[in-house]
UniProtKB/Swiss-Prot annotation:
An annotated GO BP: ephrin receptor signaling pathway
One of the record's GO molecular function terms: ephrin receptor binding
Motif PDZ-binding, chain ranges: 332-334
Lineage: Eukaryota, Metazoa, Chordata, Craniata, Vertebrata
Annotated protein name in UniProt: Ephrin-B1
Entry's family note: Belongs to the ephrin family.
Gene field: EFNB1
Biological source species: Gallus gallus
Cytoplasmic face of the membrane: 253-334
Positions in the Extracellular compartment: 26-231
Subcellular location(s) of the protein: Membrane
Length: 334
């Protein structure tokens, strides 16, 4: 009993050491999405440097009694869209700030592989952009151009797995998460009094758009998967056609071989029938006549003739007199 306990203890120590050796994920400082946030720098927005495994919370603050509530719709966009402050083409909604009575919290987890098919996935050394083209009013919630992205530089630039002290050239390869819409990321709303988290349902105002992150725009992963599917279908069709052709050729060869064998067998039977002596009469010949058949068979035996000699050449038979009958075969008289 002591050995199993010692083995479990050693295994627990090894697991603890592995956890300590692995890089610890951290939660980044939450970002309050409001026009009064001084972190949004003019012309640049907010630049952060997350690592794989980190988490980021974007907070839509609750309305203050003395100030009007700001309505925003946040999008995950490409670099050219963030620079132009336009979400006309391929809009991808992350969260909608439209609940003045409560705080809305949107959590992003930076992960390379998501357990959810529709989850967000990020790659190292790439940039991702979040912005809003709403103007802060309820009527301007659905604006697709300009908005606070242009007037207040309200955008977040996420440089995943990059060093903030490194000198990075201007031309960078930017892309969106390779998977489509984010089902794993939850929008948790809290009431300051009760602190009861609730997950918003898709389709309602203020929830994440579940239709997909790259619904209309080109996606390398999606296109590669479609090409692979079509290639597999084409290869399957070609293999199926080749199998059908092979079976047809094999069937034709088998039928030809069977037909040839049947013809040879029929010809052998006809020659054997012509050469075999039948139990027929002498058709008017004398008792001493000698008949040499075309072919003899050892198995056939007729009681009215007797084999005299067959050691050299054709066998010789002495035919006895029988009543005249119609001959069935042809014989040569010697």
């Amino acid at each position: 009993m002591a050995r199993p306990r010692g083995g479990r203890w050693l295994l627990g120590v090894l697991l603890a050491l592995c956890r300590l050796a692995a890089p610890l994920a951290k939660s980044l400082e939450p970002v309050s999405w409001s026009a009064g946030n001084p972190k949004f720098m003019s012309g640049k927005g907010l630049v952060i440097y997350p690592e794989i495994g980190d988490k980021l919370d974007i907070i839509c603050p609750k309305a203050e009694p003395s100030k009007p509530y700001d309505y925003y719709k946040l999008y995950l966009v490409k670099k050219d869209q963030a620079d132009a402050c336009s979400t006309v083409m391929d809009p991808n909604v992350l969260v909608t700030c439209n609940r003045p009575e409560q705080e809305i919290r949107f959590t992003i987890k930076f992960q390379e592989f998501s357990p959810n098919y529709m989850g967000l996935e990020f790659k190292r050394q790439q940039d991702y952009f979040i912005t809003s083209t709403s103007n802060g009013t309820l009527d301007g919630l659905e604006n697709r151009e300009g908005g606070v992205c242009q007037t207040r530089s309200m955008k977040i630039v996420m440089k995943v797995g990059q060093d903030p002290n490194a000198v990075i050239p201007e031309q960078l390869t930017t892309s969106r998460p390779s998977k489509e819409a984010d089902n794993t990321v939850k929008i948790v709303t809290q009431s300051p009094r009760h602190k009861v988290p609730t997950v918003e349902e898709p389709g309602k105002p203020g929830s994440v758009n579940q239709n997909g992150q790259e619904t209309q725009g080109p996606s390398d992963g999606f296109l590669s998967s479609k090409v692979a599917v079509f290639a597999a279908i084409g290869a399957g069709c070609v293999i199926f056609i080749l199998i059908i052709i092979f079976l047809v050729v094999l069937l034709i060869k088998i039928r030809k071989r069977h037909r040839k064998h049947t013809q040879q067998r029929a010809a052998a039977l006809s020659l054997s029938t012509l050469a075999s002596p039948k139990c027929s009469g002498n058709a008017g010949s004398e008792p001493s006549d000698i008949i040499i058949p075309l072919r003899t068979t050892e198995n056939n035996y007729c009681p009215h003739y007797e084999k005299v000699s067959g050691d050299y050449g054709h066998p010789v038979y002495i035919v006895q007199e029988m009543p005249p009958q119609s001959p069935a075969n042809i014989y040569y008289k010697v």
